[in-house]
């Protein structure tokens, strides 16, 4: 028993940079939930937090392996990707249950992959504890509009993003396979294409909006929050399980599966927006008319 307890403490010590980074990024997000902080402060803390994660994952070993130029370039690019992904996951937290349901659709495939590998890429109990925590949160948040008892806030959505990106990052480094980013693809498509759409509209990306596909479903199409959240989670789960069980475990098969899925989801997003975005424009026009009438 004492030896087992000592082993558990060794595991905690092995993860301390990740845990410290999680505390930092969740802490600044909690403060931001209470009093709005400048974007610059939040971004600096996020970059520092992911620096701690990269230290834990051994990303900085690239400097010794490939030299300073390649190591620095790869690290900076990876930092931009993970900070961007974190904020996309935060932006997607706009209807009841979506963060909890989608997190489960990412964590379950990670658990399956972790148990199918000769050497686990992350502590199995870590995934289990996080899944348990998300399930408990579901009891209070995975409810129809107006019925939720609590919300994730920035601290919840950014905290779970940090944890999932740590696990996926560890998986990618162990396997050398970047295509495991497919585990976050549904959020990635909606988030990135909505950002591109807003850039084309010359909008301030820092301002709140309702232009994500899931927001159009919930607001303009009046689809229930639980249905929208379930759709996103099930779509991601089907894609991930297909990748794990149906896709041959070869480099060309993995990249082909990823590329074809990106193309299909991108086309689906564009067709959806072409058909329904006018409803959002009508909503914005009605707001403008109300504002003019009040003046």
Go through the PLM ranges and name each one:
Residues 1-188:
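"…together with the soluble PPM/PP2C metallo-phosphatase catalytic core" -> "…together
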Residues 1-69, 175-295:
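N-terminal transmembrane signal-anchor/hairpin module of polytopic inner-membrane proteins
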């Amino acid at each position: 028993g004492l030896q087992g307890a000592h082993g558990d403490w060794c595991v905690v010590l092995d993860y301390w940079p990740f845990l410290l980074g999680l505390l930092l990024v969740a802490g600044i997000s909690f403060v931001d939930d209470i009093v709005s902080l400048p974007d610059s402060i939040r971004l600096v803390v996020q970059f520092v937090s992911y620096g701690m994660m990269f230290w834990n994952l051994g990303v900085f070993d690239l400097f010794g392996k490939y030299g300073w130029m390649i190591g620095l370039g790869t690290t900076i690019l990876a930092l931009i990707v993970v900070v961007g992904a974190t904020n996309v996951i935060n932006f997607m937290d706009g209807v009841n249950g979506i963060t909890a349901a989608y997190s489960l659709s990412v964590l379950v495939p990670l658990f399956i992959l972790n148990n199918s590998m000769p050497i686990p890429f992350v502590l199995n109990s870590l995934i289990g504890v996080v899944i348990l925590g998300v399930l408990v949160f579901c009891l209070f948040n995975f409810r129809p509009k107006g019925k939720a008892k609590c919300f994730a806030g920035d601290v919840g959505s950014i905290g779970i993003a940090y944890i999932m990106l740590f696990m996926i990052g560890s998986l990618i480094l162990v396997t050398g396979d970047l295509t495991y980013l497919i585990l976050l693809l549904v959020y990635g498509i909606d988030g990135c294409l909505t950002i591109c759409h807003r850039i084309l509209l010359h909008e301030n990306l820092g301002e709140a909006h309702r232009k994500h596909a899931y927001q159009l479903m919930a607001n303009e199409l009046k689809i229930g929050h639980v249905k929208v959240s379930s759709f996103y989670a099930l779509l991601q789960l089907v894609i991930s399980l297909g990748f794990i069980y149906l896709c041959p475990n070869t480099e060309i098969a993995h990249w082909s599966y990823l590329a074809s899925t990106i193309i299909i989801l991108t086309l689906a997003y564009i067709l959806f927006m072409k058909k329904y975005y006018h409803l959002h424009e009508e909503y914005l026009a009605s707001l403008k008319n109300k504002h003019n009438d009040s003046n």
